[in-house]
């Protein structure tokens, strides 16, 4: 399978000019966010909260797009577009570095080497308490992922980052210092300028936004012997596909990680037969099928089915 570069970063992308659809998307997201939050008092909460949560989730998808080297040739400009932390919790630089490691496809789903793996090693599983095991098992259902997943993801991310900061990790310190400045600015806008209750913003907007993004990640990868078989495709996602910037066609993204989002659907349809052959027909007919199959049933096991192989134990972190 052809790749544009192991990690799909800016160095591996085809050099092009300004990608105006992505620039327009950024204007839409930030402009919509500013208007919604500034005029929130004129809207009922049941309109404001879902609309703003959608924009925060869309912003997360845009950050994913930008870290792959879009929409300009300038990393400084791209970073300036992506770095505003309207979700509050995730430093952009931390996410960027982690996600690019995820694009080492030979290690996909590996609980030791893939930073986005949802699997545990047998040793890690045995070390967990019974309540923790239950919470992880529940998150193997779509319902559990949506309800429990955001709290689990954020709390464990904070715990891991706190360890890095305590140990004096310079990269983590830089990322969090930069992030703190952005959070202060966004918080000033939300609270001092717009008068939004911080608890309401966190619980009614950020939490559902994370849940929306977890719909995409829920079934996009599964352990398999063949590398290509580890990445799924969700077709006919006419509603959520644009929210995810067509990353629901995930096998296409992993093969061409630097391809701009608006080119993915056409490229996917041109290469559909080959992609399905390579990934073993690991495809879903929309997120409705994902929900019907896995809303209350496990999508996969918590422990990686291969256990711990010698090459996993000795591979570099």
Descriptions of predicted regions:
Residues 1-55, 85-199, 262-317:
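Non-catalytic, topology-defining segments of multipass membrane proteins
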Residues 40, 70-75, 126, 233-236:
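Helix-boundary and loop/linker segments of multi-pass membrane transporters
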Residues 54-66, 91, 95, 145-157, ...:
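Transmembrane alpha-helical segments that form the membrane-embedded catalytic/substrate-channel core
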Residues 61-80, 106-116:
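Aspartate-rich (DDxxD/NDxxD/DxxxD) Mg2+/diphosphate-binding motifs
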Residues 64, 99, 129, 221, ...:
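Divalent metal-coordination and catalytic microenvironments
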Residues 67-68, 106, 224, 244, ...:
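Short active-site segment of divalent metal-dependent hydrolases/proteases
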Residues 74-76, 178-179, 240-241:
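Short helix-capping and inter-helix turn/linker motifs at the boundaries of alpha-helical repeat units
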Residues 78-87, 229-244:
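Membrane-cytosol interface motif
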